[in-house]
């Protein structure tokens, strides 16, 4: 439970919907190897899934995977700088604020939270939790989740 929010932020940094996500910059913009690349996190009551999706030409698949693994390694071993962490938190909070404007999306999230945790945080409580996250927390959760112990590749 205490790892859900740090993992959501790490996933957003890695491959969230903005053009400045790590994977988009490294795989798509710098190397021109992918048409699209993104990461998503789906939490469940007792586990969750982090998925990284990319589309590329067949000949670029191995190089894309190598670049992705390099970024995962960096997240596991090198804490974000204070500036990087601050920018990531601000961007994530802005994305949360925009997504909360959808009443349907907000109510679905609140219902899921209530069913799973018997509680619903206000948006201000969520923002405060995001602001309180540390670079060490993000590195620790990245080390646990991206350690390489589990990986499934669909081609």
Task: Locate the predicted segments by residue.
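C-terminal regions of mature proteins
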Residues: 88-155
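His/Glu-based metal-binding/catalytic segments typifying zinc-dependent metallopeptidases
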Residues: 1-20
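Oxyanion-binding "anion nests"
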Residues: 31-33
């Amino acid at each position: 439970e205490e790892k859900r929010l740090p993992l959501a932020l790490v996933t957003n940094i890695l491959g969230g919907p903005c053009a400045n996500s790590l994977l988009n910059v490294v795989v798509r913009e710098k190397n021109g190897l992918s048409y699209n690349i993104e990461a998503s996190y789906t939490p469940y009551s007792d586990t969750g899934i982090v998925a990284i999706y990319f589309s590329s030409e067949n000949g670029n698949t191995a190089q894309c995977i190598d670049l992705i693994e390099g970024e995962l390694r960096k997240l596991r071993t090198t804490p974000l700088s204070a500036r990087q962490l601050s920018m990531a938190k601000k961007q994530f909070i802005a994305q949360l604020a925009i997504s909360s404007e959808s009443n349907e999306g907000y109510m679905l999230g609140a219902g899921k939270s209530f069913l799973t945790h018997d509680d619903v945080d206000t948006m201000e409580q969520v923002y405060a939790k995001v602001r309180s996250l540390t670079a060490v927390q993000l590195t620790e959760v990245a080390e646990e989740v991206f350690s390489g112990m589990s990986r499934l590749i669909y081609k």
